[in-house]
Design a protein with these regions (language model features):
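Surface-exposed beta-strand/loop patches in extracellular or lumenal glycoproteins
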Residues: 509-521
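Hydrophobic residues within beta-strands of alpha/beta enzymes
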Residues: 85, 237-239
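C-terminal beta-strand-rich structural cap/linker in extracellular carbohydrate-active enzymes
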Residues: 538-558
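Loop/helix patches that line or flank the sugar-binding groove of alpha-linked glycan CAZymes
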Residues: 11-13, 34-41, 62, 256, ...
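Solvent-exposed beta-hairpin/edge-strand motifs
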Residues: 519-532
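Flexible loop/turn segments at secondary-structure boundaries
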Residues: 27, 93-94, 140-142, 187, ...
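Acidic/aromatic-lined carbohydrate-recognition and catalytic surfaces
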Residues: 2-48, 52-227, 231, 244-299, ...
Length: 558
């Protein structure tokens, strides 16, 4: 589905989002951090609060990025050409899950900055035409949130029913209430609370107790959180693990054949949908046209599609199946076909994402090949839908190699969270003063950094910039309809159309050149090629029907 003449077109359909993991983007103001934590200027933040993982060194705290580091690089993001930023959590947190365990939804953690720092970042982003969405973590809080501290103190506590509690089995008190498994490490999704002699549910770490969204007071309280950030001017929310909010109150066992899979990857309960309709109605009433983007980690497009509702639930839902494709045409053809068959009929606008803070970077998944990463960039930014870029993919970064003694995440996600290198200096543009960053810099940082690649007209960074400029210029690519074409086994071919504009996205997944062009196409002009210098298809020239090894192009009917 594409835009009809005269139809209002929401800003988030035309935008490219840039995902920033604040810990890993840039450290700019270490002195401000020490001041916020009340420490001498020559002392690190160790011991001020638990801003890392038990046993991790002070680098996890001292070497983390901050909000000021994001603000100072806003001009670079404008130069790159993205339209909106998504910020992973920066809220007050013990950091057991690096901010996804929230102790205060409305406060900025001093590790990252102050409330004034956030407001300045938001205002200066808006001044540059960049919208900003923030993470909303509604399934669970930190066990240090005042609600849970109160809830665990007594069965009669005011906030007791904000969480999910169950009595122990009278015949086997050591057996959890059901067989659900938690994410991040081995073990049940239940912890026994000795003080009140009941189990509480946590689909993730024991330090992340699940909220009970069947309680209207929880819905009201979390709606107030959304209102707080909307009042401050944010442009929407990425909603964490949104499919897990509604739960069967009977809490039945997982079927035996999937019992070993964490329940957070299985929960798909109809009770979530009324919650989303309530939140959507609330968000839609705000004048900045906020967007809701849901993390629906169910790995089937048919399941993801349900969370759009009848255009009354999520505005956008992350569709992760393409992220699990190897670098092969057949898998991506199937994913494109599913998206068009399942989302287009219900006018649900797709998303496209290949990397994020929870999965290995796609260049790493594709065998470390920059050629493949460049082709993937053309595909990602050429498909119908809203693309999400993960900071650093425009540099062609691979996952960092993190030795055992430096590992901080028990979930194995450290590699994709390596700090962004801004230049070729020893600290790569971070204000580290010779200290270590919270994680090692990624491979090749000495030459694969922003300053070096920005000066190279043939770099992958310049390719991303050219692709983003192309999206702004070509209506067919930005918001046109999509049609999957018949093509050779190793070629993905998608026709994009918007009124009189017609483009084709062609991706050769083979390591050999292929001669092929869209059937019955008239003269075609090459708009962009992933191959750079020496490409068989030179931008600005006629398309001769030849694709180089693992080359992707976007061509337009002349």
């Amino acid at each position: 589905m594409s835009e009809a003449p005269g139809e209002a077109w929401p800003w988030w359909k035309e935008s490219v989002f840039y995902h920033i993991y604040p810990r890993s983007f840039c450290l700019a103001d270490p002195d401000g951090r020490r001041q916020r934590l009340g420490l001498p200027q020559d002392q690190g933040v160790a011991g001020a609060s638990d801003h890392g993982v038990a046993g991790a060194s002070d680098r996890v705290r001292d070497g983390a990025g901050d909000l000021e580091g994001i603000r100072r690089h806003l001009d670079h993001l404008v130069w790159l050409g993205v339209d909106a930023l998504w910020l992973s959590p920066f809220y007050s947190s013990p950091m057991k899950d690096f901010g996804y365990d929230v102790a205060d939804y409305c406060a900025v953690d001093p590790l990252f900055g102050s409330g004034a720092d956030f407001d300045r970042l938001l205002a200066e982003s808006h001044d540059r035409g960049l919208r900003v969405i923030v993470d909303f973590v509604p399934n669970h809080t930190s066990d240090q949130h005042p609600w849970f501290l109160d809830a665990r103190s007594s069965r009669l506590a005011e906030h007791r029913d904000f969480y999910v509690w169950r009595d122990p089995d009278p015949e086997d008190a050591a057996r959890p209430p059901n067989n659900w498994r938690r994410s991040f490490g081995e073990g049940p999704a239940w912890t026994f609370e000795e003080t009140t002699a009941q189990w509480y549910l946590h689909l993730f770490l024991p330090e992340q107790p699940d909220l009970d969204w069947s309680n209207p007071a929880v819905v009201d309280a979390m709606e107030a959180v959304l209102g707080h950030w909307l009042e401050r001017g944010v442009d929407g929310f990425r909603i964490d693990v949104v499919h897990a909010l509604g739960k069967d109150p009977a809490l039945p066992d997982a079927p035996a054949e999937v019992a070993a899979i964490p329940w957070s990857a299985l929960n798909d309960d109809e009770r979530t949908h009324p919650i989303l309709r309530r939140l959507r109605s609330f968000v839609d009433a705000w004048p900045q046209e906020p967007v809701t983007v849901g993390e629906v980690f169910l790995i089937k497009t048919a399941l993801v599609a349900k969370y759009y509702g009848d255009d009354d639930e999520l505005h956008l839902a992350f569709n992760f199946p393409p992220m699990f494709c190897p670098f092969e045409a057949g898998c991506f053809k199937r994913r494109v076909a599913e998206i068009e068959q399942l989302l287009a009929p219900k006018a649900a606008w797709p998303t496209w994402v290949l990397s994020n803070h929870d999965r290995p970077r796609h260049r790493t998944r594709y065998g470390g090949s920059e050629r493949r990463a460049r082709a993937a960039a053309v595909m990602l930014l050429g498909m119908r839908g809203t693309p999400f870029l993960y900071a650093g993919e425009e540099l062609g970064l691979e996952d960092a190699l993190v030795p055992d003694e430096l590992v901080v995440d028990p979930g194995g996600r450290d590699g994709c969270r390596a700090p962004i290198p801004w230049d070729s200096s020893s600290d790569h543009g971070w204000a580290l003063g010779g200290a270590d960053p919270w994680l090692p810099f990624p491979p090749e940082a000495a030459h694969r950094n922003v300053a070096t690649l920005a000066a190279d007209p043939s770099s992958i960074l310049q390719l991303y910039r050219q692709l983003l400029a192309l999206r702004r210029e070509a209506a067919a690519v930005r918001k046109g309809a999509a049609e999957l074409l018949e093509s050779p086994d190793d070629v993905l071919a998608v026709r994009r159309t918007a009124h009189a504009d017609e483009c084709f996205v062609l991706v050769n997944f083979s390591a050999a050149p292929i001669t092929w062009g869209p059937p019955a196409a008239e003269a075609l002009l090459v708009l962009i090629s992933s191959a750079g210098e020496g490409a068989l298809s030179t931008p600005g020239s006629p398309y001769e029907g030849a694709l180089g090894p693992e080359e992707a192009v976007i061509v337009r009917r002349a």
